[in-house]
Amino acid sequence: MSRNEVLLNGDINFKEVRCVGDNGEVYGIISSKEALKIAQNLGLDLVLISASAKPPVCKVMDYNKFRYQNEKKIKEAKKKQKQIEIKEIKLSTQIAQNDINYKVKHAREFIESNKHVKFKVVLKGRESQNSKAGLDVLFRVQTMMQDLANPEKEPKTEGRFVSWMFVPKAKEAPKNEKKTKENNPPFNRINLMKGENHAKNED
């Protein structure tokens, strides 16, 4: 907020204003000149809060301190809004279990670092016509990730790949666990195949 965006001190000129203090003080309905005098006596600023109110509302405050704190809050909020990092892990339909274990180990490390993980199974030859083999691999992965991550929506077929995004589980209070399980039933092979058939029907 800049001084150009608000009216304060001598720029406020109303016959009557509702004047309040920064700590809840109520000075009542007085002229803007009287309100400014109160602010000056306290070594503070008179700031117009609501020009549309009847009468307009003004607040006695340290405007520079208010602006500094407001800008600080905005900067802190931007720092918290970190871009989500997505790690991609490729698999094949013929992958051995020990290789899945190795890749899932790294995926779990990414999840623990608050990253999202996208598993992509490569479909070769006729596999691209039927993604069941790819879904089987993803389902095996899901059972190994379910204690740490939640699948985002359902698997997607993308050309020669079938993919599934996993995101870190949100920390929930114990009392909400039962409700969460009821509202979010675990994925299973039947659900996955239903989703695949539904996607084919849409095509």
Swiss-Prot record:
InterPro entries: T_IF-3_C_sf, T_IF-3_N_sf, Translation_initiation_fac3_CS, Translation_initiation_fac_3, Translation_initiation_fac_3_C, Translation_initiation_fac_3_N. Residues 172-203 are annotated as: Disordered. GO terms for biological process: ribosome disassembly. Coiled coil: none annotated. One of its GO terms (molecular function) is ribosome binding. SUPFAM superfamilies: Translation initiation factor IF3, C-terminal domain (SSF55200), Translation initiation factor IF3, N-terminal domain (SSF54364). The keyword DNA-binding does not apply. Belongs to the IF-3 family. IF-3 binds to the 30S ribosomal subunit and shifts the equilibrium between 70S ribosomes and their 50S and 30S subunits in favor of the free subunits, thus enhancing the availability of 30S subunits on which protein synthesis initiation begins. This is Translation initiation factor IF-3. The gene is infC.
